[in-house]
Amino acid sequence: MQFIDQARITVRGGRGGDGIAAFRREKYVPAGGPSGGDGGCGAPVVLEADSNLQTLLDFKYKRLFAADDGRRGGPNKCTGASGKDLVIKVPCGTEVRHLRTGILLGDLTAPGERLTVAFGGRGGLGNAHYLSNRNRAPEKFTEGREGEEWPLQLELKLLAEVGIIGLPNAGKSTLIAVLSAARPKIADYPFTTLVPNLGVVRRPSGDGTVFADIPGLIEGAAQGSGLGHDFLRHIERTRLLIHLVDAGSEDPVADLNVVQQELEAYGHGLVDRPRLLVINKQELVSEDDLPKLQQELKEASGRPVLCISAAMGTNLDQLLAETWVELGV
């Protein structure tokens, strides 16, 4: 399935139904008064968060969403039927903004959470409203009003508590596959992961914690280079980052600094997010050199450094233990 995390749509509330001019016509009331009913209200457009959706793909091919119009009024002061609400399902984690102003209208994070994004127009008034002492047989009625119409920007930010970050080929997909039931595409070349992958990792209590494998960052990602700019938004909601550094890299310290700089450039508080610094693929470094590398990264980052091998399953229990401590679970 194609992963789409941004979409532009237009929503339009239904038009209100027209009021009508009508008069009572009964056998023994030859000169009945006005009885024109009001028009029904136009339907609103409502967005609803749905936990079964993972992408905004549905909005790639359909951009205009128009709700039902209200019905016109009827005789005997009958009000026309209102339009049925147009409910549009979106993934949990969808932010909704006005396209032209950028104003945040809502952030749908909980399943079933709703946001009305366009109200329908009010129904028109029937001529029964215009009866007066001066005019006993008014012909006047009003038309229904147009519904609201707005251009919207939808932006999906995945709901994950833990984000796994690092340069391409650092082993992020392997780690999430080993820790969870996720089955991302894995290969030994950069940019194998082209979309974020989610996996659920069980806590000691048995509850699940969502981990996200974010496609590899490169230098300049925050300015749009590579894949990082498109997907950094998906770690904005995380509570913890696991930063993987490839032990087999030519310059692991430089790799560390690239990711650090990109987090700083992107902003949104990512650089201050709690983070575990982890050397992956420790089997690629000799037992004598591994402590040296660990010390170099510690001095460069000011953080403790864990050593693991996702592929070999080495020290993963220690990594998870540190993760649960950071999350307070």
UniProtKB/Swiss-Prot annotation:
Binding site for Mg(2+): S173, T193
Binding site for ATP: 166-173, 191-195, 213-216, 280-283, 309-311
Keyword Cell membrane: no
One Gene Ontology biological process: ribosome biogenesis
Alphabetical keyword list: ATP-binding, Cytoplasm, GTP-binding, Hydrolase, Magnesium, Metal-binding, Nucleotide-binding
Main location: cytoplasm
Tagged with keyword GTP-binding: yes
CDD domains: Obg
Domain of life: Bacteria
EC number: 3.6.5.-
Cofactor dependence: Mg(2+)
NCBIfam families per record: Obg_CgtA, PRK12297.1, PRK12299.1, small_GTP
Self-association state and partner proteins as the record states: Monomer.
Family as reported in the entry's similarity comment: Belongs to the TRAFAC class OBG-HflX-like GTPase superfamily. OBG GTPase family.
Function: An essential GTPase which binds GTP, GDP and possibly (p)ppGpp with moderate affinity, with high nucleotide exchange rates and a fairly low GTP hydrolysis rate. Plays a role in control of the cell cycle, stress response, ribosome biogenesis and in those bacteria that undergo differentiation, in morphogenesis control.
This protein's name: GTPase Obg
Species name: Synechococcus sp. (strain CC9605)
Lineage start: Bacteria, Bacillati, Cyanobacteriota, Cyanophyceae, Synechococcales
Gene: obg
